[in-house]
Amino acid sequence: MNIHAIISDQIHKAMLAAGVPPYYRVQVRPSVKKKFGDYQINGLMATAKQLGVPSYFLAKKVVSFLQLNGIARQIDIAGPGFINIYLDSQWLATKIATAIASPRLGISLIELPQTIVVDYSSPNIAKEMHVGHIRSTIIGDASARILDFIGHKVIRINHIGDWGTHFGMLIAYLQQVEKNIDPEIPLSFLDQLYRQAKDKYDTDPSFAQEARNCVVKLQCGDSFCLKIWQKLVKITINENQKIYNRLNISLSHENIMGESKYNNMLPNIIADLKAKGLAVESAGATVIFLNEFQDKQGNPLGVIIQKKDGAYLYTTTDIACIKYRYEQLKADRIIYYVDSRQHQHLKQIWTIVRKAGYIPQTMQLDHHMFGMIFDKEGKPFKTRVGVNIKLNDLLDEALKRARCLILSKNMDVDPVELEHLAQVISISAIKYAELSKNRTTDYIFNWDDMLSFEGNTAPYILYAYTRIASILKRSNYNKQQILTGSILLEKEHEHLLAVRLLQYHETITTVAHDGRPHILCGYLYNLAVRFSSFYEHCSIINANSDIQRKSRLQLALLTSKTLQHGLSLLGIETVDKM
């Protein structure tokens, strides 16, 4: 049940009835201060100015047509034209009862579901996952879960880097120093081999040429190169899957559609782009010149899609990739979770595929970019010697710190329980610290902040959840007994908690639309804070009557279910006690 949508719809109808043209819109938002009601309507003053009428007069006229009978108990006009809406407690109570009884907490499926490809994580083969992969992996996974929940058909794709120049380096290097690859060797060893191969590639021109030759051989299906490539891929994806499992990321082998998948499409893509006059020969290479992008001299920017040695580029693969996703996967929308440095590359690809007619002009392509992670000194988050921190090492450090945190609060904790709690807290702390930040901004990685039991952190919200579980247990009622009572919202804090609980639907809708999980994190934190205030002012166990006790227990139960559900959409597990 989406309160924001209900009020927005009625406001729009009231504005039309008041003679306001349909292209004028106002903002409906939850009130920050309780003295301004539960919701505020902003923007009428700007509309009135455009229409040349007094803003208070327009607000009064709109309110006269506003049909919120049974929903709002009071509607006020404040100042020159702000509209404050106070929701009816009885109406809220009926909606709370509906939400508690619903497996989906009263949240309906979207009316027009789409097939949405979510492209995220995308590590390179033969390299260990590092902290640079954490934002794409965690944010992309949460967004995929949320889109899935509201009813879209979500196709998760892990577009791994399993093709390209770095394979030429590795294959050429292995031919020289280590012809056989044991399938059981650790990924860390391959990572070392890659760095050695890269050093040789950068300093030895003859080796660099041999590496480029190996790339072409691989792309042409050379059996020796393919055999080595297959072993490298298998070792890497098996190791990466362990990290996904550890982080509770909903990616598996079935979601892998790497760059190599599109290799057979590339010759036809090149031929087609030439036939359509989009691609031309330039200095031996095949290039597409885009008027939409200029070089430093102001000339159309050339995008190379095939080198003069016949090798293809990431650009070529990405063109084929979008074509495949539209034609074969029937995607209505594609969302990319890659960092901001890829933005121009993606815009160029999108321009090419639209010009080529590979996708409709109206197809939605979104780049949900994200910022960087810094250390406390404001430098890129790396090891002391300046290399990227391995993701496994980061998770191990989080686990160690979580164990110490738990023991500092309870030295007598059972060892098995300690390990389980440490696993949950460590993973949730890292994921929540990532998800609670606006993805477009940079942030500072701070262990003390993310493991704190105060503020907008995973430990705080997990503790709030366990606190409610304890209250429900101490009530000596089972769930069925709790639900037999009526819901009463007689006190201010009962009303405020009910409003916040019913704002879950609109929060999920916003997060799904914008791909910004930090909005959901902010909601869950605010809900936990509001419950704490409710619990402080409204006794539950020692309520004045059984009716009041059961009513407040229902509010507690729905808060518990909402916290658990919201965390699950973020890919975070809950615990029953801490």
From Swiss-Prot:
In alphabetical order, the GO MF annotations are: arginine-tRNA ligase activity; ATP binding
InterPro entries of this UniProt entry? aa-tRNA-synth_I_CS (IPR001412), Arg-tRNA-ligase (IPR001278), Arg-tRNA-synth_N (IPR005148), Arg-tRNA-synth_N_sf (IPR036695), ArgRS_core (IPR035684), DALR_anticod-bd (IPR008909), Rossmann-like_a/b/a_fold (IPR014729), tRNAsynth_Ia_anticodon-bd (IPR009080)
**Which GO BP annotation is one of this protein's?**
arginyl-tRNA aminoacylation
Q: Does the keyword Aminoacyl-tRNA synthetase apply?
A: yes
The Gene Ontology CC terms held by the record are: cytoplasm
The record's section on Pfam families has:
Arg_tRNA_synt_N (PF03485), DALR_1 (PF05746), tRNA-synt_1d (PF00750)
Entry's PROSITE patterns? AA_TRNA_LIGASE_I
Catalytic activity entry: tRNA(Arg) + L-arginine + ATP = L-arginyl-tRNA(Arg) + AMP + diphosphate
Q: Does the keyword Nucleotide-binding apply?
A: yes
- Cited SMART domains: Arg_tRNA_synt_N (SM01016), DALR_1 (SM00836)
Q: What class of enzyme is it?
A: ligase
Enzyme Commission number, as recorded = 6.1.1.19
Q: Which cellular compartments is it found in? A: Cytoplasm
Alphabetized, the UniProt keywords read: Aminoacyl-tRNA synthetase, ATP-binding, Cytoplasm, Ligase, Nucleotide-binding, Protein biosynthesis
Q: According to the UniProt entry, where does the motif 'HIGH' region sit in this chain? A: 123-133
Q: How does it assemble?
A: Monomer.
Q: Which PANTHER family match?
A: ARGININE--TRNA LIGASE, CYTOPLASMIC, ARGINYL-TRNA SYNTHETASE
Family per UniProt? Answer: Belongs to the class-I aminoacyl-tRNA synthetase family.
What name is this protein filed under?
A: Arginine--tRNA ligase
Q: Which organism is it from?
A: Baumannia cicadellinicola subsp. Homalodisca coagulata
